[in-house]
Amino acid sequence: LHGYFTALRKMFASVGKVRFFLDQDSGMRGACLSAFRDRIIGGTCDAFFVRIAKDLTIDEKRRRMRDAKAEFDLYASTMPGLDEDGVRLAMIKDRIQSAQSIGPWKDRWVFMPLPGMSEPEKAVCHLTDLGRYDPDHLAWLYNKASLHAVDSFFNRIRRRSSMLERPVSSSANRGRVWNQSSAYRPEQVAKIQNIIRACHNYVWVPEGKKAERGTPAVRLGLAKAPLTLEDIIYFKSS
């Protein structure tokens, strides 16, 4: 992990501001804070943990969303002059102020108002809070924190390879799971992941009006244009 974040440190050298929204992992925290230490101190890098309830059923997610909406509406009724974004900002600021320090690292978790179906009970912890931001700026940074892009990437990988699909649960089999398409030789999974990684970074171009232009390799300056599979297989330069 440290090598990965060190590589990112070099790639992001010309980037003005860097924000990391990380899954809750102590190794990832240490690697990120170590590799970007100077930029964190200099005020050009921030890191946040993002935590969501991953094991809820659809009905449970809907119930939690209804509860969160009711709480939001009650809070909004005390601030009739604000629109939804203004109420959300005020609510986050209040929750930041009342957050309690937890654990040996004194993490202060803040539950976000109006979480979506994809991120139920979303909570955010600012890992690099040096007291440099005003309350409004800090609240909007909390509001931006999300793992949605990461989850979308994982789902895309699962759809591309049957080996990586989620296991199937059966009520008739006492809740046991069945990995229908699992590889008999685990090393095959690593090979598939390498192929998907190359295609994602160099070949597949995002679609849609809001999609970023080019491939990740093009946006990072590692390639001049999207490649084809033939370019990669036969080592053609771009």
PLM features per residue range, with description:
Residues L1-F21, T228:
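Short, basic/hydrophobic alpha-helical segments
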Residues L1-L8, G43-Y142, S146-F153:
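Low-complexity, serine/threonine/proline-enriched polar segments
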Residues F20-D23, D151, H200, T228:
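Short, conserved catalytic/metal-binding motifs centered on acidic residues
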Residues Q24-S26, F154, D231:
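Short, flexible loop/turn elements at secondary-structure junctions
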Residues S26-F36:
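A short acidic (Asp/Glu
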Residues F36-I40, D46-K54, A172-Q180, E207-I232:
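C-terminal/domain-terminus segments
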Residues V124-C125, W140-N143, L164, A183-P186, ...:
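C-terminal domain-tail junction helix/linker
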Residues A145-R176:
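Short amphipathic alpha-helical "interface-anchor" segments enriched in bulky aromatics
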